[in-house]
């Protein structure tokens, strides 16, 4: 039973990420576009958030709330830039939506890989970049509700983004 609970909680946490991207794609399709570049836009936003969190904490910042706020703003800005690139290419230049979207997916993955390796090198080349203060703000749970046994673990053991 414990492995089922762990599987279910992981599915909810990782499914939320896919849900955010799918919601954006649904809104795009309501506007008449097929944006296959959603994963690339998500990569760009994620690496922007990681970089802002990394440099905030490296500069001596210790407030989890400020680190979380900066990383969220950077994610939004990075994703907006990715969306603007797609919009400029498909609307202004009338490029093929399928080709542009797939190119943006490849581009976003490459950008995230390049800057992720650069940040990893700056952090000592350990392969994992830690944002201890910022990640504690994202993982904050409601203490009373998350301790309600199986029910609390299934429904209240996630951060505020889920």
Feature map (PLM): residue ranges:
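Transmembrane helix-bundle core of multi-pass membrane transporters
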Residues: 108-162
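Short capping/connector residues at structural and topological boundaries
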Residues: 23, 32, 38-41, 120, ...
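Hydrophobic alpha-helical segments embedded in the membrane of multi-pass proteins
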Residues: 15-24, 40-47, 80-84
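Membrane-interfacial amphipathic/re-entrant helices at transmembrane-helix boundaries
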Residues: 1-21, 34, 48, 57-73
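Short, non-helical or kinked segments that cap or interrupt transmembrane helices
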Residues: 26-48, 69, 91-104
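Transmembrane helix-loop junctions in multipass membrane proteins, especially transporters and channels
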Residues: 26-33, 58-62, 95, 118-125
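Alpha-helical transmembrane segments within multi-pass membrane transporters and channels
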Residues: 61-111
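Membrane-interface helix caps of multi-pass small-molecule transporters
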Residues: 27, 51, 55, 84, ...
């Amino acid at each position: 039973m414990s492995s089922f609970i762990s599987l279910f909680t992981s599915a909810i946490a990782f499914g939320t990420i896919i849900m955010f991207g799918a919601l954006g794609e649904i809104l795009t399709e309501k506007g008449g576009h097929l944006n296959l570049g959603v994963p690339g836009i998500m990569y760009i936003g994620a690496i922007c958030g990681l970089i802002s969190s990394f440099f905030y904490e490296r500069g001596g910042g210790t407030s989890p709330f400020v680190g979380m706020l900066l990383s969220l703003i950077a994610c939004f800005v990075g994703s907006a830039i990715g969306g603007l690139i797609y919009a400029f290419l498909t609307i202004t230049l009338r490029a093929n939506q399928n080709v542009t979207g797939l190119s943006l997916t490849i581009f976003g993955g490459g950008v995230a890989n390049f800057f992720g390796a650069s940040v990893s090198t700056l952090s000592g080349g350990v392969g994992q970049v830690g944002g201890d203060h910022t990640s504690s703000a994202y993982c904050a749970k409601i203490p009373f509700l998350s301790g309600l046994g199986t029910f609390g673990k299934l429904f209240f053991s996630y951060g505020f983004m889920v």
